[in-house]
């Protein structure tokens, strides 16, 4: 639910705060992608997975995603490079978190880092590349559109879950797939 509500909220806030416009096709694409993403969770919602507490948590998380997406998108625009912005953000995070991890986890943290340094380095490099690409795109296109496209990764997770782990991929998920892919096609074919 969070991943589906964040793109239209991001696009709306980008319009209200920085005057970014999407046009009809852009809004249609964002809404189609968002509805498709929410539809992926339809089975869980139907089983009573949405309570007042979980809805509040989901909407709070939506707010956090919207805020960091706008801040990071604008930061990338100011620096002129998604890569530079992400590199500085990751460096600042490491500088702040490394001493905290040492303080709270001590020798255990050092041992875990020693054992998994290559995995951590690879994961960090992939995270840097992935987010830098998204932020680079935000220097060229409206933040709301990039935010919507970025969230389509949940579709790949659903497909991999079905293929690799035998998770069900019934009619509701097919409708979600059509909506998400339709939204992407609207963006591409309309030149948005």
Question: Model-derived features: where do they sit?
Answer:
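Structural motif at transmembrane-helix junctions in multi-pass transporters
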Residues: 1-2, 21, 77-84, 133-152
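Alpha-helical transmembrane segments of compact multi-pass small-molecule transporters, enriched
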Residues: 2-16, 92-96, 130-133, 149-163, ...
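Specific transmembrane alpha-helical segments of multi-pass solute transporters/efflux pumps
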Residues: 3, 8-13, 19, 63-71, ...
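Hydrophobic residues within alpha-helical transmembrane segments
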Residues: 5, 27-31, 56, 60, ...
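Hydrophobic transmembrane alpha-helices of multi-pass small-molecule transport proteins
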Residues: 11-15, 24-44, 173-191
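Membrane-interface helix caps of multi-pass small-molecule transporters
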Residues: 12-16, 20-21, 74, 78, ...
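Membrane-interface interhelical linkers
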Residues: 35, 42-57, 91-123, 128, ...
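Glycine-/small-residue-enriched transmembrane alpha-helix faces in small-molecule transporters
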Residues: 48-84, 192
